[in-house]
């Protein structure tokens, strides 16, 4: 199974990239995790709707055909670590590749969110973009460790 994290925004602080890379390299070959960063649309004089539509086009271009799409959304379904582990297990059993999408500073296009297979939220808090990348990859690693009874996660 291939798990692709599509993130709007290319530049993150070094600490965030280091943390992301540390978790990403822990995944086994049968669960390949890839990060695809897509360019944030410059604001200029564009309406928010046009800006998000342009980012949507880039996001969709980064997602392989046939992928299950999971959008991170502040109004999405709250998930616990155990629920995320269950989702991950089900994704693996389905054999589908999965793309988890992190929106930019203005979020994700409404139509894109509606077309996603799932919408989840990581927290009720507003988090900086770089922190979301790190939090997501850590939680995915934790979820994977739960599915194989690895001692990383403790109840």
Curated annotation (Swiss-Prot):
It is found in: Cytoplasm. Its EC number is 2.1.1.177. InterPro entries: Alpha/beta_knot_MTases, RlmH-like, tRNA_m1G_MTases_N. Pfam families: SPOUT_MTase. The keyword Phosphoprotein does not apply. GO terms for cellular component: cytoplasm. Keywords: Cytoplasm, Methyltransferase, rRNA processing, S-adenosyl-L-methionine, Transferase. S-adenosyl-L-methionine binds at residues 72, 103, 122-127. It comes from the Bacteria. Its main location: cytoplasm. It is an enzyme of class 2 (transferase). It catalyses: pseudouridine(1915) in 23S rRNA + S-adenosyl-L-methionine = N(3)-methylpseudouridine(1915) in 23S rRNA + S-adenosyl-L-homocysteine + H(+). GO terms for molecular function: rRNA (pseudouridine-N3-)-methyltransferase activity. NCBIfam families: PRK00103.1-4. Homodimer. Belongs to the RNA methyltransferase RlmH family. Specifically methylates the pseudouridine at position 1915 (m3Psi1915) in 23S rRNA. This is Ribosomal RNA large subunit methyltransferase H. The gene is rlmH.
